[in-house]
Amino acid sequence: QLSLPAWNFATPYSQLSASVHLPWSALEPKGVGVLTTSIEGHIGSEDLKSVMSMVDAGDAAQMIPSAPLQLALVANGNMDHLQLTDCKAQLQGMLALDVKGDVYHLVQDTLSATSNPMGAAVNYHLAFQNMKPLLSRLGVADTTLCIPMGTSVRGRVDMEGNSYDATAAVKALDGFIDLEASTNLD
């Protein structure tokens, strides 16, 4: 088993704290062990640029906004059922993503793939604030794409095997639109 009760990482620009408890049996297809993990912190733009230069990402490092990337993750479960109780990413003042839900049958043997296909039931919320700095770094002109401040997208994604269902409620300014989509890739 892997057990990291408290792990901290810091640079002048970033800070991450984590705890992990992982019995090896949690990684088996019908695992009985329970993984518990918690990660929280922020990654500064200078550190992101350093990593991107190490992986030879070309001009992509220039697109990173100056705001730090804030992260939070709390997950419990095993390969049969993993619960995401808190999963957040935020570029302060620009956008925030919040995801919660359940993922099922992450690892399968060939016999159980048809009787217990991989599945998920996930709720999400994406909130846009001032996107102009990020869009300009990406080379997108204001006239090409405009995301009004306060725009939000809330919805749900359900998946079972190759069958997908999704909903989204988009609110921007004084308007809104509700969307639904389904597909089966079989």
Region spans (language model):
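Short acidic/polar N-terminal linker immediately downstream of export determinants
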Residues: P65-S66
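Extended lipid/amphipathic-ligand handling interfaces
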Residues: Q1, A6-F9, L16-G41, L69-D80, ...
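Intrinsically disordered, low-complexity segments enriched in glycine and mixed charged residues
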Residues: Y124-L126
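Extracellular/lumenal and peripheral-membrane lipid-interaction modules
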Residues: L135
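Extracellular loop and loop/strand-boundary signature of outer-membrane beta-barrel proteins
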Residues: A57-A61, G139-D142
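Outer-membrane beta-barrel translocator/channel fold
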Residues: G44-M52
